[in-house]
Amino acid sequence: MKIKAYAKINIALDIVGKREDGYHILKMIMQTIDLYDIIEIEKTESEIRLNCNKHYVPTDERNLAYKAAKIFKETYSISQGVDIKLTKNIPVSAGLAGGSTDAAGVLKLMNKMFNVNASDEELKSIGLRLGADVPYCIKGGTALCEGIGEKITQLKSFKDKIIVLVKPPFGVSTKEVYKCFDLSKVVFHPKIDSLIENMNNDDVYFVANNMKNLLENVTLRKHRVITNIKEEMKSIGSIGTMMSGSGPTVFALFDDMLKAQLCYDEMKKKYKDVFITRTI
């Protein structure tokens, strides 16, 4: 069995508080994009095996796809194992939910393969044990995600918007970024309600001008190259740029495919991980 596991970007990422257990309380607009890993699974006698086309990706319990298989087996008392083949296209430690979407893909595939017939809500509940973005990745699309990622409201689709992604040649630890975040210093929060209203009207220009990610400044302080990427993409014709998630990937919105292609060509001269894609 095979599935495409899609990446996401954040159109808005707000932090509205912190729980006693240390988790930040979030309010985010998430959007699936047409960049994906491919996951194939087959049944084995009992053990879980994971193979990946990228040598630097761990293939043991450090990998969320492996963890997802293990938790699914335990939750539904499945004695058989799975052989997972992961074809990775989404950059790692990039702010694009690459690990989370792989985990969600494994949960969905195993649900079908073993005829468990768990609902999306059940899969989301298992997913939350793996990471805050996993529940969203079960369904994907355009969604408002709140709490620690567990409250998901599907929104009207904001599909077919042209996106160029650039990931600088380093990864970022989400944990470290949240550790350095100081809510008391935030003056302006994302206008999430206005963004949703204008996304419903398909107003890409309002969205481009009002996208906001509270984690951006934290990552920018350590990595000035993110500012350089944003400025260069704007100078080539992007109508709006922002860092996705905890970074370091920057995405740019375009209203013209020729400008997007020019941006892709220019950025590809400097960076390895550059993609031209669209929202889906």
From Swiss-Prot:
Active site: 8, 133
GO biological process terms held by the UniProt record: isopentenyl diphosphate biosynthetic process, methylerythritol 4-phosphate pathway; terpenoid biosynthetic process
Binding site for ATP: 91-101
Domain of life: Bacteria
A molecular function (GO) term: ATP binding
EC number of this enzyme: 2.7.1.148
Gene3D superfamilies reported for this sequence: 3.30.230.10, GHMP kinase, C-terminal domain (3.30.70.890)
Record keyword Transferase present: yes
SUPFAM superfamilies for the chain: GHMP Kinase, C-terminal domain (SSF55060), Ribosomal protein S5 domain 2-like (SSF54211)
InterPro entries xrefs: GHMP_kinase_C_dom, GHMP_kinase_C_sf, GHMP_kinase_N_dom, IspE, Ribosomal_Su5_D2-typ_SF, Ribsml_uS5_D2-typ_fold_subgr
Family matches, as Pfam families: GHMP_kinases_C (PF08544), GHMP_kinases_N (PF00288)
Pathways involved: Isoprenoid biosynthesis; isopentenyl diphosphate biosynthesis via DXP pathway; isopentenyl diphosphate from 1-deoxy-D-xylulose 5-phosphate: step 3/6
Catalytic activity: 4-CDP-2-C-methyl-D-erythritol + ATP = 4-CDP-2-C-methyl-D-erythritol 2-phosphate + ADP + H(+)
Keywords: ATP-binding, Isoprene biosynthesis, Kinase, Nucleotide-binding, Transferase
Enzyme class: transferase
Signal peptide limits: none
Keyword Transferase listed: yes
Sequence similarity: Belongs to the GHMP kinase family. IspE subfamily.
Function: Catalyzes the phosphorylation of the position 2 hydroxy group of 4-diphosphocytidyl-2C-methyl-D-erythritol.
HAMAP family associated with the record: IspE
Record's protein name: 4-diphosphocytidyl-2-C-methyl-D-erythritol kinase
Annotated source species: Clostridium beijerinckii (strain ATCC 51743 / NCIMB 8052) (Clostridium acetobutylicum)
Lineage of origin: Bacteria, Bacillati, Bacillota, Clostridia, Eubacteriales
Gene: ispE
